[in-house]
Amino acid sequence: MFTLEEANAALTALRPIVERMVQHRRDLTAPQARQTELVTRIAGNGGDMVPSDLQDLAETIQREADAISDCAEQINQAGAQVKSLEEGLLDFPAKRGEEDVLLCWKLGEEIGRAHV
């Protein structure tokens, strides 16, 4: 469980990890779209396709996915929860009185609110 002060202090270490995670997610989008396009082409007739293209894309996708997983694992080990890869949204478990809540933080913003 985090206090607001502890969550803010944790952001010092977590912010660069979240920034990397969001960037890796962005870097994953184009190769995934291209892979879908190639798979569709293969299902048709495979026309004008270089076989190594699909392998290269698969390797790029795996590399980016692994990097995202590594970032998420570091965040989880610090006690925070990843809620959105695209937005860099984290929750920090906390208490408000006797109630369990989550302190919500989005990359580029301050910890904004608590929710159940």
Annotate the PLM regions:
Residues 14-31, 57, 61-64, 68-71, ...:
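Amphipathic alpha-helical coiled-coil segments
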Residues 71-92:
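Long amphipathic alpha-helical coiled-coil segments
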Residues 1-41:
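Long, hydrophobic N-terminal alpha-helical segment
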Residues 30-66:
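Structured domain cores in non-transmembrane regions
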Residues 114-116:
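Conserved small/polar residues in nucleotide/adenosyl-binding loops
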Residues 98-99, 105-108:
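Core subunits and conserved enzymes of cellular information-processing
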